């Protein structure tokens, strides 16, 4: 078996590593660097440049130089975050025919996986140059909070690059593998804080060692997949643009060339301010007007940068609290804090994380390389080169289906270890229903409409039967890559239907954040809605059973009683369409009061049936002259 390489496909930079025996090794690219900018350029003469060569020519070719494509992968054009990027990116972001976010370069429409594949090809070539043999398999990392669509799109990018993606692995988990592999014996609980170029993740991971085998178990994960170094850069760029506008009266946003130079300068200044207290952004001939050329020379202090991005850093703290809560731990239970991603080099980020956990983060993990190393380790586990390592990851959000009353019924709860499979039996809501629609949802709210729809499909050919009788088995299966497969089967007819969640119906990052926040903020509203649905279902059942009893009673039910019951049934039916739980309960009570005569008739009929049954049994026993008899009680199926 050939080598399975480990690739960290980052928003800003990418990195590739392999297992050299039992030691992971980060590989240098053709330019001699251990990381490669995730930048792709299409030149005027038809050449495709990747990495540092693409970055070097960006200033002269801004519209055809693509960066931060990971922010678009597996996303819809109408997503709020994509729309924000549309206004600030120098290249053209467009809507594909299926509604996905694509880019247009020199009149050609391109999907994000196509573009990311160019970076993966360079990673593949770097590994092949080092190994001297073809490479066809890889483990690729994604943010822990990436959804089905984004994971699927990342696998597609690998396939386009000529790689069979053996496993998609979460970035914080990969970093934990890199950290934990060479550490001594003993059990540890670590927090991996991963703030990269475009995404943020926090994972709480337990490393256990039993008889020489290390188990890496993710207890909980949280994050924000639209928060990263690119956002920090944008804040500084906006500040510099406004300062220049105040000074010169010229808005640089209308000049793509100037904005590209400014982007490079802002990124450089941000990095310098991690070690220096102040820096100069000096850009001669940044633009010109009728009076001549204009130069930018603005002093930026570390304090100024921190004031510009403080709210971004604070945004990363809330997911830390949720992850700890989900893991059932407090900050004192965390033994080590690992920082991953280039943006964690910022002193303010390190300070905030240290304040939250009450301990200094470890400095012996390379934030740019740890994720690729972990991916290579996972590759080694899959080939058998790395033994005695078990990785247990989780799904970041709850998954379920819409059931009667517009409720989401959860089949797999968030932070469930994957791969996992869960089945549950549901039934029909109407008599003689021949088809059911399986509506797949992702999120934490009780009301189906408040969660993200991942897709839906129909199961047809159900045999006619009273409501509640057919048995529809719904199965959710999440594979090791975190990708969801759903099937529904009619246990009576054997008919089955399956769906794999496709890239066109994934969640976007902010929606995930919003779902969890909404679930916490709206816990009381959710509880009330759940109670309303329960009451509605009770009312619906009462409606159904009362109508059946009226039918069975026939002429035995006096006309006055029948009229009163019909009136109460209509009133209850109207109340069930509303949102008032108390009104439904009141109408149920009224129906019960006017149905007393009906209940008496029903009880009499039931007693007569039992008496008739007992008499028949006695006569049969006498006729057959049977001395010993065995009786088996047959209970009605509910």
Swiss-Prot record:
Region feature (Disordered): 602-638
Sorted alphabetically, which keywords does the UniProt record give? Acetylation, ATP-binding, Chaperone, Nucleotide-binding, Phosphoprotein, Stress response
Positions carrying Phosphothreonine: 199
Note whether Phosphoprotein occurs among the keywords: yes
Q: Which InterPro entries match?
A: ATPase_NBD, Chaperone_DnaK, Heat_shock_70_CS, HSP70_C_sf, HSP70_peptide-bd_sf, Hsp_70_fam
Q: What induces this one? A: By stress conditions e.g. heat shock.
Record's keyword annotation contains tRNA processing:
no
A GO MF label: ATP-dependent protein folding chaperone
Q: Where N6-acetyllysine occurs along the chain?
A: 109, 245, 304, 421, 556
The annotated regions of Low complexity compositional bias extend over: 602-620
Q: What does this protein do?
A: Acts as a chaperone.
Q: Which NCBIfam families match?
A: PRK00290.1 (NF001413), PRK05183.1 (NF003520), prok_dnaK (TIGR02350)
In the record, the note on similarity to other proteins reads: Belongs to the heat shock protein 70 family.
The molecule here is called Chaperone protein DnaK
Q: Which organism encodes this protein?
A: Shigella flexneri
């Amino acid at each position: 078996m050939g080598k399975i390489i480990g690739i960290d496909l980052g928003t800003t930079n990418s990195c590739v590593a392999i297992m050299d025996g039992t030691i992971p090794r980060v590989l240098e690219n053709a330019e001699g660097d251990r990381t490669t900018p995730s930048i792709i350029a299409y030149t005027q003469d038809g050449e495709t440049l990747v990495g540092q060569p693409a970055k070097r020519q960006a200033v002269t070719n801004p519209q055809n130089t693509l960066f931060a494509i990971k922010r678009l992968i597996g996303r819809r054009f109408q997503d709020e975050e994509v729309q924000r990027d549309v206004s600030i990116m120098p290249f053209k972001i467009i809507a594909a025919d299926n509604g996905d976010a694509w880019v247009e370069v020199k009149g050609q429409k391109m999907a994000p996986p196509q573009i990311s594949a160019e970076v993966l090809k360079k990673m593949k070539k770097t590994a092949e140059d080092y190994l001297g043999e073809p490479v066809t398999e890889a483990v690729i990392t994604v943010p822990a909070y990436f959804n089905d669509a984004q994971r699927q799109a990342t696998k597609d990018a690998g396939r386009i690059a000529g790689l069979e993606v053996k496993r998609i692995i979460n970035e914080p988990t990969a970093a934990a593998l890199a950290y934990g592999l060479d550490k001594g014996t003993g059990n540890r609980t670590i927090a991996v804080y991963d703030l990269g170029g475009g995404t943020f993740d926090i994972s709480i991971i337990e490393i256990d060692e039993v008889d020489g085998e290390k188990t890496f178990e993710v207890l909980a994960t949280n994050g924000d997949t639209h928060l990263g170094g690119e956002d920090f850069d944008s804040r500084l760029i906006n500040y510099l643009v406004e300062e220049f506008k105040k000074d010169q009266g010229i808005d640089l946003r209308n000049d793509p060339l100037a904005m590209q130079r400014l982007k490079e300068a802002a990124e450089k200044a941000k990095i310098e301010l991690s070690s220096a207290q102040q820096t100069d952004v000096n850009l001669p001939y940044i633009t010109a007007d009728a009076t001549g050329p204009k130069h930018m020379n603005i002093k930026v202090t570390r304090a100024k940068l921190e004031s510009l991005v403080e709210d971004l850093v604070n945004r990363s703290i809330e997911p830390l609290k949720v992850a700890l809560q989900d893991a059932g731990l407090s900050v004192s239970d965390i033994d080590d804090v690992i920082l991953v991603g280039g943006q964690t080099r910022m002193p303010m980020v390190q300070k905030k994380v240290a304040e939250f956990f009450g301990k200094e983060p470890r400095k012996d993990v390379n934030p740019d390389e740890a994720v690729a190393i972990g991916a290579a380790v996972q590759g080694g586990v899959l080939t058998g080169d790395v033994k005695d390592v078990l990785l247990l990851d989780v799904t970041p959000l709850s998954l379920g289906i819409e059931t009667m009353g517009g409720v989401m019924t959860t089949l797999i709860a968030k932070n469930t270890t994957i791969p996992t499979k869960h089945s549950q039996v549901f039934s029909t809501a109407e008599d003689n229903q021949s088809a059911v629609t399986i509506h797949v949802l992702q999120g934490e709210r009780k009301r189906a409409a408040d969660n993200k729809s991942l897709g839906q499909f129909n199961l047809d050919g159900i045999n006619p039967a009273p409501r509640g009788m057919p048995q529809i088995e719904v199965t959710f299966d999440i594979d090791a890559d975190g990708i969801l497969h759903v099937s529904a089967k009619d246990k009576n007819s054997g008919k089955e239907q399956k769906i794999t969640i496709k890239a066109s119906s994934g969640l976007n990052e902010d929606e995930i954040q919003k779902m969890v926040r909404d679930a916490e903020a709206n816990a009381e509203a959710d509880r009330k809605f759940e109670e309303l649905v329960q009451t509605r279902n009770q009312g619906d059942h009462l409606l159904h059973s009362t109508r059946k009893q009226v039918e069975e009673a026939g002429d035995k039910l006096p006309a006055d009683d029948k009229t009163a019951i019909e009136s109460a049934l209509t009133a209850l039916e109207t109340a069930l369409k509303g949102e008032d739980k108390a009104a439904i309960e009141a109408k149920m009570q009224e129906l019960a009061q006017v149905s007393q005569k009906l209940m008496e008739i029903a009880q009499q009929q039931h007693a007569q049936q039992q008496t008739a049954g007992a008499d028949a049994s006695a006569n049969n026993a006498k006729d057959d002259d049977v001395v010993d008899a065995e009786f088996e009680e047959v209970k009605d199926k509910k």
